[in-house]
């Protein structure tokens, strides 16, 4: 083979799309599509048609640029097999490692609290509205559901992980199917409410504030940051030795881009389908009732007068069941991350990092009691889920997903080539706007 043929062959091999790339594209996509998606239509549709159209424009840039920034941070470490904690420690020392451990824990733990509230409300709504049963005590329901999940986690962790992986695709398929099935019920209410002469840009209900608050729920819903570190390590081990780090970075960016496109297409279609079926007032009611949009849809179809179609009856029951399954799936997935993070913190500060001083069983028990206990307290208190996402969940995710990579790009020599780019300004702005939601909630 001539030198030219060798070069052409090498270039073809480099540019080819591998099966593993498709697997990771779907993996990133599947990680993001969870219970958080069930709240996005409520916040997105709350302000009517114009804000959700602006969110549609912002959705892909937020998903792609923010996750690409985190991937670049993970790629910047000298060890191809090093995870994000090792990379941050390499750039900023042991203190950086402690900070990232705290960030990971506090980025995931509030999500468990959110899911604890959600699963309690969804179950009680299904019990009272679809099954027509008498109301139950909230504290007892929350305790029962959490003990049930704790039992499954304690005695069947491996089975739980396997079942979770099987649930991802049926859930995504059900979202697409519901979105399509709602089309016959679309109406023009959301379009009829658009009055260009009375549109307010500022103020409590203005378009800018609505979109600003919507950015938080987008950061929360379009989030696959927990898996980015593992994804980058896998791609570095696959590509870096043969093709170099620059090629690996381009390949990671390409995969993140395709995953973001899939994610935005599915979630935004679902949001628009819900909005055209319901109305901004319905979305406000769903927020006030503190339930996911599928539960509200179930109640909406249950309240239809006259003879209901078979689909309406199926959706009335199916939507709540799908919501429950989605929340269980998301709770289990985030529990594993929370447990790992809390175990690390307890080990680091309680036992000075000495694994010989405590058994893994005892460590898991201590962490489980704290996690389930705190989740039960929050579930019983029943704070508004969207407010909790905007004030706690999304800002912590944004600090990890947006601001940490931007700080690293400014400080770490290995990331110097990414300085001075316009997309850095965009990612920083998204991170700051999301965190500033905390200030907005205070006033």
Curated annotation (Swiss-Prot):
One GO MF term attached to the UniProt entry: threonine efflux transmembrane transporter activity
Catalysed reactions, semicolon-separated: L-threonine(in) + H(+)(in) = L-threonine(out) + H(+)(out); L-serine(in) + H(+)(in) = L-serine(out) + H(+)(out)
InterPro entries in the record: Amino_acid_transport_2, Hydroxy_aa_transpt, Thr/Ser_transpt_TdcC
Family as reported in the entry's similarity comment: Belongs to the amino acid/polyamine transporter 2 family. SdaC/TdcC subfamily.
Keyword terms: Amino-acid transport, Cell inner membrane, Cell membrane, Membrane, Symport, Transmembrane, Transmembrane helix, Transport
Species per Swiss-Prot/TrEMBL record: Salmonella arizonae (strain ATCC BAA-731 / CDC346-86 / RSK2980)
Membrane topology value: Multi-pass membrane protein
GO cellular component, one term: plasma membrane
Location relative to the cell: Cell inner membrane
Gene3D superfamilies (alphabetical): Amino acid/polyamine transporter I
Disulphides: none
Residue intervals passing through the bilayer: 22-42, 44-64, 97-117, 140-160, 163-183, 207-227, 259-279, 319-339, 366-386, 389-409, 423-443
Official protein name in the record: Threonine/serine transporter TdcC
UniProt function note: Involved in the import of threonine and serine into the cell, with the concomitant import of a proton (symport system).
PANTHER family: SERINE TRANSPORTER (PTHR35334), THREONINE_SERINE TRANSPORTER TDCC (PTHR35334:SF1)
Family matches, as NCBIfam families: PRK13629.1, stp
Principal subcellular localisation of the protein: membrane
């Amino acid at each position: 083979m001539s030198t030219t043929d060798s070069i052409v062959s090498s270039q073809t091999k480099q540019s080819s799309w591998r099966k593993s790339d498709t697997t990771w594209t779907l993996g990133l996509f599947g990680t993001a599509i969870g219970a958080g998606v069930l709240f996005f239509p409520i916040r997105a549709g709350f302000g009517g048609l114009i804000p959700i159209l602006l969110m549609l424009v912002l959705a892909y840039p937020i998903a792609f640029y923010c996750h690409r920034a985190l991937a670049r941070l993970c790629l910047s470490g000298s060890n191809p097999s090093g995870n994000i904690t090792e990379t941050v420690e390499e750039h900023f020392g042991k203190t950086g490692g402690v900070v990232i451990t705290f960030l990971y824990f506090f980025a995931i733990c509030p999500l468990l609290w959110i899911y604890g509230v959600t699963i309690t409300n969804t179950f009680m709504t299904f019990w009272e509205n679809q099954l027509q049963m008498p109301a139950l005590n909230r504290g007892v329901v929350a305790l029962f559901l959490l003990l049930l999940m704790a039992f499954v986690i304690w005695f069947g962790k491996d089975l739980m992980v396997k079942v979770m992986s099987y649930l991802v695709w049926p859930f995504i398929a059900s979202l697409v199917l519901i979105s399509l099935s709602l089309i016959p019920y679309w109406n023009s209410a959301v379009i009829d409410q658009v009055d260009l002469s009375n549109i307010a840009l500022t103020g409590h209900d203005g378009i800018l504030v609505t979109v600003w608050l919507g950015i938080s729920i987008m950061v929360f819903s379009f989030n696959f940051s927990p898996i980015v570190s593992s994804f980058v390590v896998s791609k570095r081990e696959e590509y870096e030795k043969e093709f170099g780090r620059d090629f690996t970075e381009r390949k990671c960016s390409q995969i993140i881009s395709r995953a973001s496109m899939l994610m935005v297409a599915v979630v935004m279609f679902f949001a628009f389908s819900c909005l055209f079926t319901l109305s901004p007032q319905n979305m406000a009611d769903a927020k006030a009732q503190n339930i996911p949009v599928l539960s509200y849809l179930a109640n909406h179809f249950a309240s239809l007068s006259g003879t209901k179609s078979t689909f309406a009856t199926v959706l009335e029951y199916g939507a709540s069941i799908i919501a429950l399954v989605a929340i269980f799936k998301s709770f289990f997935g985030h529990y594993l991350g929370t447990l790992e993070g809390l175990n690390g913190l307890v080990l680091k500060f309680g036992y000075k990092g000495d694994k010989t001083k405590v058994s893994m069983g005892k460590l898991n028990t201590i962490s489980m009691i704290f996690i389930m206990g705190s989740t039960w307290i929050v579930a019983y208190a029943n704070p508004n889920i969207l407010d909790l996402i905007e004030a706690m969940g999304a800002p912590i995710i944004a600090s990890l997903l947006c601001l940490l990579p931007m700080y690293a790009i400014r400080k770490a020599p290995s990331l110097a080539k990414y300085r001075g780019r316009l997309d850095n300004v965009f990612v920083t702005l998204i991170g700051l706007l999301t965190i500033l939601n905390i200030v907005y909630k205070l006033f």
